[in-house]
Amino acid sequence: MATVNQLVRKSRSRKLIKNNVPALNKCPQKRGVCIRVYTTTPKKPNSALRKVCRVRLTNGYEVTAYIGGEGHNLQEHSVILIRGGRVKDLPGVRYHVIRGALDCSGVKSRSQGRSKYGVKKKK
């Protein structure tokens, strides 16, 4: 344990907390414009064509966001809303597109977990 004299000379260092979503600037969501919509392949044990898009945010950042759900209507110049949340098997993808907000439509024929995919209740 440090003595009082040692602490006077050099105070204790604070633990640095890493920010996993720096582009959001402490906001819950951010708006952006799609620059490029494309598919990528995941890391080693998995195999698929994951839908992602490159987004230029309102604060000037340019990030890659994952488009969840089956099918989407996004193309270049679509205005979307992104949230934090990484995709474990896609390196460099730390954001998710919010379905059912702005230009991004909700997932068609979704009956369970609708709130995550921007689908209204079926009558």
UniProtKB/Swiss-Prot annotation:
Gene3D superfamilies: Nucleic acid-binding proteins (2.40.50.140). One of its GO terms (molecular function) is tRNA binding. Belongs to the universal ribosomal protein uS12 family. GO terms for cellular component: small ribosomal subunit. Disulfide bonds: none annotated. Part of the 30S ribosomal subunit. Contacts proteins S8 and S17. May interact with IF1 in the 30S initiation complex. Transmembrane segments: none annotated. The keyword Transcription does not apply. The gene is rpsL. With S4 and S5 plays an important role in translational accuracy. One of its GO terms (biological process) is translation. It comes from the Bacteria. SUPFAM superfamilies: Nucleic acid-binding proteins. Keywords: Methylation, Ribonucleoprotein, Ribosomal protein, RNA-binding, rRNA-binding, tRNA-binding. The modification 3-methylthioaspartic acid is found at residue 89. This is Small ribosomal subunit protein uS12. Pfam families: Ribosom_S12_S23. PANTHER family: 30S RIBOSOMAL PROTEIN S12 FAMILY MEMBER.
